[in-house]
Amino acid sequence: MKIKIDSLDNIHAAAKKFLQNMGDGKVFAFYGKMGAGKTTFVKAICEELGVEDVITSPTFALVNEYTAGNGDPIYHFDFYRIKKIDEVYDMGYEDYFYGGNLCFLEWPEPIEDLLPEDCTKVTITVEEDGSRSVEF
């Protein structure tokens, strides 16, 4: 599936479309260059799920936990600064990835060997006109 985001004005419509088409998946790995909009898109998805917390990139915390409107936890990861895979083992990644709750992962490249088999890979691309394409 491919979703086009022309501007920030329609990012919530794109997030709704993503949610309508994401299936039963729980773990989503977001790929894209720096500045492609991974955090912005995850933020819009979380807002559409009823998260009222301030949603930020967990670059330094590694993981942020939010509460969806239905009370379920949502986990937002950023693996950009991972230096050693042991850091991911130490945080107990299996509890998150296999716990049955939504997990949104930015910069998953350093931990690809640990991703669940049913992880959905989402690629955000900056198009020549400045719009974004979200493919999954």
Feature names for model-found ranges:
Residues 34:
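The conserved Walker
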Residues 28-30:
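Hydrophobic anchor at the beta1->P-loop junction of P-loop NTPases
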Residues 1, 47, 86-88, 94-136:
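Short phosphate-coordinating micro-motif centered on Lys-Gly-acidic
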Residues 1-17:
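N-terminal pre-Walker A segment at the start of P-loop NTPase domains
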